[in-house]
Design a protein with these regions (language model features):
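Trp/Phe/Arg-rich N-terminal binding region typifying the photolyase-homology
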Residues: 1-160, 265
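Alpha-helical context
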Residues: 7, 36, 40, 90, ...
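Glycine/tryptophan-enriched, flexible segments
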Residues: 142-298
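Small-residue-rich helix-loop
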Residues: 294, 302-307
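Pre-Walker A segment
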Residues: 310-311
Length: 311
């Protein structure tokens, strides 16, 4: 076992229910968290994501400091940054999986790099209830229909969900593996349009928990109706927090199970979590969905051009 560990953070900006971070803190004397900002992943269409990322890094860094764990931020291609880690550094690398085809393919190259350089590594289940590889039909083929997929997935998760010790162990001192680290503020969009945005959102783990409590307390009962009314704050507001991993889907699912009287809205919301699981399965078994239709007969779907229908 190496003395030092690096936890490679990608979409898991949380200390609660973070298996990679918990494992590293429990088994290594010195721990550092690493985020790699790849500019290629953030074009002009993703300016809002850059703002959320910047604020997430700031808040997550503060959360980690409570455990004497530093957050280091590097800019560049993931492979180029991780090449700097050598065997003589005597460090182990840990991370959580992301279930997107392109990221999975890049992950294979990174694992090959670590094997080639004799770097110890370990990865853990990501922000999902059940990994898509475990959910197939009895004949081994993937599901294309939601209802049977989610019925089987939910039953499987309930029966197999293990209880793990995911507490973060505080370190005696902080370390920095890299000589220099960029500031989260350097990732902010150049134009400060986000000033108004900040009146409505604060990307942090604590706020994710707050929105979950609001959902359970006052929204989920009527979720099936109010989520579709623009003038009513009827949605959970948890989507961006899930995207950046400031809350784990398991945390949401388990909190929902604590509801004593489960109304129709409860099932509606739980099914939304199911659609998230289903989407992970579909894009991996049918990656053509990322650029086209799952069913080819919809490629030339006839559109009716009639302005009266829009009145």
């Amino acid at each position: 076992m190496t003395k030092k560990a690096i936890v490679w953070i990608r979409e898991d900006f949380r200390v609660e229910n973070n298996e990679a971070l918990a494992y590293a803190s429990q088994t290594h004397e010195l721990v550092s968290a690493l985020y790699i900002y790849n500019p290629k992943n953030f074009d002009k269409k993703r300016e809002a994501q850059k703002w959320w990322l910047s604020r997430s890094l700031e808040n997550f860094s503060l959360d980690l400091k409570k455990f004497n764990i530093s957050l280091e931020i590097q800019s560049g291609d993931e492979l180029d940054i991780l090449k700097n880690i050598k065997k003589e550094d005597d460090v182990s690398i840990y991370w959580s999986k992301i279930y997107e085809p392109d990221i999975i393919n890049k992950g294979k190259k990174i694992r090959d790099l670590f094997i080639q350089n004799d770097i110890k590594y370990k990865y853990f289940k990501g922000n999902i209830l059940v990994e898509f590889q475990e959910m197939t039909k009895d004949d081994g083929t993937p599901y294309k229909v939601f209802t049977p997929f989610w019925r089987k997935t939910e039953q499987f998760y309930i029966s197999k969900s293990p209880t793990k010790n995911l507490k973060i162990k505080s370190k005696e001192k902080m370390i920095n593996f890299f000589k220099k680290s960029i500031s989260p503020k350097e990732l902010l969009p150049k134009k400060n349009w986000y000033k108004k945005f900040e009146k409505y959102w604060n990307p942090s783990e604590d706020n994710a928990k707050k929105y979950l409590q609001e959902l359970i307390k006052s929204k989920i009962e009527n979720y099936g109706e109010t989520r579709d009314i623009p003038g009513v704050s009827g949605t959970s507001k948890l989507s961006p927090f899930l995207k950046f991993g400031q809350i784990h889907v398991e945390t949401i699912w388990k909190k929902c199970q604590d509801i004593k009287v489960k109304q129709v809205g409860y099932r509606k919301y739980i099914n939304e979590l199911g659609w998230r699981e289903f989407s992970h399965s579909l894009i991996n078994y049918f990656p053509q969905m990322l650029k086209g239709n799952l069913r080819k007969d919809f490629d030339n779907f006839p559109w009716v051009k009639n302005e009266k229908f829009l009145e």
